[in-house]
């Protein structure tokens, strides 16, 4: 609720006597009904009351909020539209400090009618994991996900790997210490995601994760172990969970296609995770067979859960930003409800790079179909 508290405090500073002060009283009463953190509210309120002309009136409102029973709002009061923000922040986890970037889109004015559900004001969250030799701002520039998120709207979280954890800034998807739910990088990424959900107006049922290369491999691991947190996953030029257990097996998997868990593995099939995969068939860094294995595991899990899938080849519908479109084989596995649960975009002559990305970032292929747009479209079909 801290996000809303800050917004309402700013509203209080702008309010004046008379009708607007009465409206502010209703806003704060509604906040108290939805959030038990009264001390936090009081702190923000006192800061708002620092303007001499309002001190007495605001003190009266504070007393009224404590003593007066709730009554329905008589009219709608809203703030001005909130501007977009792309900020650099720090997250502490198990003694380490992790940098991350967060994009918050230009959100509409807050609906403050008592009859309006708070859930209606919440937006999706997409977690984006960069690849090796990248950082968060670079990945944001290359994928242009922020520009798309501004229109959706949704928040975008860009965690950043520690240089001391991997000299190339790769996520350690190949290390057994970072392949489970409760330890290592997957645990950190899940904890960071939950913190953002708690602090910003995020719909917890519409949270997604995607990544490129090592980031794609880590996204697959994190999603597989956190089906209670993520509603879908996107893997671009990555590898399936279980493809490697050390550096040597990682290089082997990258060269020839990694070993994924067998389709009959109960641990792999216990939860269904909608999955979209992008992979260039000319990728010389991560073998395209890895994309095939991710799709195989995802469809096997769906079949085992009783979801009947229809496989179809869908014509390409998203041109590249440059207008020079690479031919793409898009395979869609959809269910009776017409939603696609698995998609595989195999990009002809596509390199080891984010398809349809901007040259402003590293490891991008501006000539490919727009992977960011395709992933967002796929994600928004699904919720937990």
Predicted feature residues:
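A domain-start/cap signature at the N-terminus of enzymes
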Residues: 1-125, 137-138, 143, 210, ...
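Serine-hydrolase catalytic machinery in alpha/beta-hydrolase-like enzymes
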Residues: 2-6, 93, 99, 112-208, ...
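Extracytoplasmic, non-cytosolic globular domains
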Residues: 222, 229, 274, 289-302
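Short beta-strand/loop motif that positions the catalytic acidic residue
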Residues: 277-279, 283
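Post-His helix in hydrolase/transferase enzymes
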Residues: 323, 359-371
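Active-site-adjacent mobile loop/cap segments within catalytic or ligand-binding domains
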Residues: 344-358
């Amino acid at each position: 609720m801290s996000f809303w508290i800050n917004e309402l405090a700013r509203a209080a500073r702008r309010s004046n006597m008379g009708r607007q002060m009465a409206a502010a009283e209703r806003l704060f009463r509604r906040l108290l009904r939805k959030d038990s953190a009264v001390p936090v509210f009081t702190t923000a309120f006192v800061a708002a009351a620092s303007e001499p002309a309002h001190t007495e009136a605001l003190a009266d409102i504070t007393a009224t909020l404590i003593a007066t029973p709730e009554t329905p709002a008589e009219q709608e009061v809203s703030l001005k539209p909130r501007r977009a923000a792309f900020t650099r922040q720090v997250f502490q986890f198990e003694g380490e400090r992790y940098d991350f970037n967060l994009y918050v889109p230009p959100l509409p004015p807050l609906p403050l009618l008592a009859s309006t559900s708070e859930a209606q004001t919440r937006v999706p969250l997409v977690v984006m994991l960069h690849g090796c030799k990248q950082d968060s701002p670079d990945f944001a520039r290359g994928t242009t996900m922020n520009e798309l998120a501004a229109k959706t709207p949704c928040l975008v979280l860009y965690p950043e790997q520690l240089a001391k954890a991997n000299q190339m800034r790769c996520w350690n998807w190949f290390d057994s210490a970072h392949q489970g739910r409760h330890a290592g990088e997957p645990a950190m990424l899940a904890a960071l995601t939950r913190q953002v959900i708690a602090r910003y107006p995020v719909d917890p049922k519409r949270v997604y994760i995607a990544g490129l290369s090592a980031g794609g491999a880590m996204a697959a691991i994190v999603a597989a172990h956190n089906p209670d947190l993520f509603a879908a996953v996107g893997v671009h030029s990555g590898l399936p969970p279980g493809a490697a257990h050390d550096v040597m097996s990682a290089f082997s998997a990258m060269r020839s296609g990694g070993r994924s868990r067998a389709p009959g593995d109960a641990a792999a099939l216990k939860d269904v995770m909608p999955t979209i995969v992008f992979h260039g068939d000319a990728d010389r860094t991560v073998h395209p067979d890895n994309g095939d294995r991710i799709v195989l595991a995802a469809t096997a899990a769906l079949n085992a859960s009783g979801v009947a899938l229809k496989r179809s080849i869908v014509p390409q519908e998203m041109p590249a930003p440059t207008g020079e479109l690479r031919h793409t084989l898009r395979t869609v596995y959809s269910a009776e409800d017409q939603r696609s649960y698995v998609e595989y975009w195999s990009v002809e002559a596509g390199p080891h790079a984010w398809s349809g990305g901007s040259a402003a970032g590293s490891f991008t292929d501006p000539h490919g179909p727009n992977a960011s747009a395709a992933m967002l479209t796929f994600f928004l079909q699904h919720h937990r």
